[in-house]
Amino acid sequence: MKIEILYFADFKDITGKSREFIELKENTVEGLTSKIFNKYNTLKNLIWDDENKKLKGNISIVINDKLIKEKNKGKMKLIDGDKVAFLLPFAGG
């Protein structure tokens, strides 16, 4: 299946892209992140909690313009044509 990934902020800086399409065999968010980490290892530090072996809790995931609120975001199923974005927490003042 083919998934579109949208990159913003630090993600865009690291990848040098605002979007890309990735062929995916495993149909979960964790499967997608694994594929992304193989291509852009630096992204792993931004969104992966090595100690707990899961996505960091402060990372927001948007699939097809809908914010995912499930506790275990990594297990979310993806289907062909999904559009996915990972968002870092907003800072301001």
Give the role of each language-model region.
Residues 1-92:
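Ubiquitin-like/PB1-type beta-grasp interaction modules and other compact soluble beta-rich domains
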